[in-house]
Amino acid sequence: AWAAQDGAGNILPPLRIDAAAEDWPASLRSEHAPAAIFCINMIHIAPWAAAQGLLRHAGHLLPPGGSLILYGPFRRGDRPLEPGNAAFDASLRERNPEWGLRDLNEVAALAAEAGFGEPKIVEMPANNLSVVFRKQAAR
């Protein structure tokens, strides 16, 4: 809404996409090819296949230097979860065993397979992270 109000013509409205789908809308590969993808609070409230699809498609769609930005809570290796995130993770897994906080190392490994470099991690309020992956030049 703010982008439309401010006349930011280079920001499209949010798209409803099945992240796990084999194919994404053809328009994303043509007139609406993204320079960045911003995904907020999705990969922990979806099956792992959704994270895999998001990273795979982002790797195909984004140009070198393009950004994939993920926002939300993550597990961080062997670090214990904060009590609030531990309770949230348990609640998610109780509602659906395919849901839950994802390990950042596993997400980064998927990103590397899709052609992204090491993530830049920004600590955010409420034990969330902004994780920025940049697409690397083709090898």
Q: PLM features: residue spans?
A:
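A short, conserved alpha-helix within the catalytic core of class I
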Residues: 45-61
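Short alpha-helix
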Residues: 3, 97-115
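Class I SAM-dependent methyltransferase SAM/SAH-binding core
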Residues: 1-26
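Conserved beta-strand signature within the Rossmann-like core of class I S-adenosyl-L-methionine
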Residues: 62-77
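A conserved beta-strand element that flanks and buttresses the S-adenosyl-L-methionine
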Residues: 38
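Core SAM-dependent methyltransferase catalytic element
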Residues: 114-139
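Conserved Class I S-adenosyl-L-methionine
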Residues: 81-105
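Glycine-rich phosphate-binding loop signature in dinucleotide/nucleotide-binding domains
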Residues: 28-33
